[in-house]
Amino acid sequence: MYLPQNKLKDWRVRHQPKACPLLLRKTSDWVVDHCHKSGMVRGVVSRVGNSLLGKIENFAYRRCQVSQSHLPAVLRAIADYVEQEQLDVLHPVGLTQLSKDLNP
């Protein structure tokens, strides 16, 4: 289905969720997100969430040479990595912050 520009706002209003599916929070500033390669609509997201998604996609494609089809797997791996249990080793930057916290 082709969605002309003059129908975009009405479509967005009818399809916007209660909260942004990317940032998991309510907003009043919605946009219709689309794949820049295919032009197909992915959904309705917050403007800030859409901006974040664009920055992540551009960085992954341009700097990391991650293909569009491989990006979801990479993002899942990043989420798994961030959620994993931390090692019992303090980084030097952590020591600096700890000393600031202990000696205000």
Regions found by a protein language model. Name each.
Residues 1-19:
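Short, charged surface segments at domain edges that flank catalytic/cofactor-binding sites
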Residues 1-7, 46, 71, 96:
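General structural signal for secondary-structure boundaries
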Residues 5, 19-58:
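Histidine-centered nuclease catalytic patch
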Residues 8-12, 49, 71, 78:
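Generic structural signal of hydrophobic/aromatic residues within well-ordered alpha-helices
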Residues 37-40, 53-103:
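Polybasic, low-complexity binding patches
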